[in-house]
Amino acid sequence: DQGVFGSFVPFQLLGSLAKSDPDGDSPLLPGLTNLQAALFFGTAPLFGATPIHYLAGVFDVDGLPTGLQYVPTGNFLDFLESAIVWQPTKFFLDYDEVLAGVDNPFDDNLAAVTIPVYNWGAAGGVGPYGTEMFGLLGSRDVAENLVSLHPPEEILLEFGHIDLFIAQNSPDLAWKPLLDWLNAHR
């Protein structure tokens, strides 16, 4: 009854430290500066064995992120500072089970979904993991826009989950196709 129901999300702290003391030592990732730590959390595949990442990075020869491809660093730090501080533990459990293919209740009733469905995502984000669910839907009006700008072997350079929302090119690559689909389904 006294279990852990939420986990700390360090985004606000990362953003604040990277803005106020970018070259200072990171308390969250020893050996990196505050700015490097923020960029690491934005660009690294942090979801286990999947290549899912938040933002497409620019990397040095050692693989450390030095910047972002589609988002000005200042915009990313602003995003971090406005992010949530806690996420429900159950969310991560359910999410991990879906990614791992563990039987769970989330796909039990997908055949009852008969409305039009649009899978909107980033090839370097969670988007590709929704594609396999299409075959479980009752709807036959299913469309997909997975923003992809790189070949599979460059997955860490690929458009990421948060790039969909804050990248400078997201209006044309992500939002316009969504608007067109919505207008076609009025």
Predicted features and spans:
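Generic alpha-helical secondary structure signal
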Residues: N104, D108, T131, N169-K176
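Catalytic active-site module of serine/aspartate enzymes centered on a nucleophile-bearing elbow/loop
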Residues: A143-R186
